[in-house]
């Protein structure tokens, strides 16, 4: 039976002219036959969900270590929240929802165990060998490290998905070829030699909504988790005018709410207002730009999906509060120091004796390598660990493992 792919409603019921088009993608590094029932962007999304890297997000954390409790966000729950917000934004702006969701689902693949603490520690030990960047690591995972298919390494995503993964926060190069945020990580440059991701342009609008959805999600859930842990109080939230306004609104409508419901009512309003703000800014910028294709979005001189100046200031205030009250809290700092020690110790142990990695693939793969390529493979192995696995690996190799509670 022949299936009419164009009649299946891929990517949303209606797409604007500036949306990424699943029928005219720039293809994959390794050509494949079309699916009769899914668009290329749907296939990307599905491949992302079925990876080992996606499953590992369940046991990777951002601020609160996995042992802290069952109700704190993990990388997986955060990723699902980001994907939901990204899809809502994409629908409102008539974009390809599948591409936006796929970029949101893959954006955290390269994160190490123990959140940014683990990344900082891994970057420090890898500095003599080029350092570590979680965005570049995400690219390595989906183009090299996932080994599922008979004909290629990685999961062979479309150009649009890879572009969104690499450039969702904006161009990596100026038109003159200078890094916009410092030197471009070598793994990204290496891949672009095979499949040019046009690092000097903006990404699709689908990738941009995935990026701003990430900001919305983590600001909101870090407040929620901070209140749950006791590191934040409602009084602290009232120091920020935007949050104080939301709290007053909830109190006026529900004067006797219990704390947990009060928190939820604040958080849902925060997400709604931020989403509405992004949609308003995007619509305004689109009306000025008048793009006729996704290429016009890439050629623009600024991001289209972003906060207004007022909401950007609120975003800065929230981040400053989270940094002061949570990320720099003495208890969190003690835990972070222990987590960094675990990563540093494991790197040293595996570099000195790769057999301690207890994986035939990894041991065989780095046998006889010089220090630089060996370090990169050890970094790949460490970056793929979950919090719980890293802790258990450290306990096996060392007499004392830091207490991360």
UniProtKB/Swiss-Prot annotation:
InterPro entries: dGTPase, Diverse_Catalytic_Enzymes, dNTPase_2, HD/PDEase_dom, HD_domain, PHydrolase_assoc_dom. Keywords: Hydrolase. Residues 75-219 form the HD domain. One of its GO terms (molecular function) is triphosphoric monoester hydrolase activity. It comes from the Bacteria. Transmembrane segments: none annotated. The keyword Hydrolase applies. Belongs to the dGTPase family. Type 2 subfamily. This is Deoxyguanosinetriphosphate triphosphohydrolase-like protein. It comes from Rhizobium etli (strain CIAT 652).
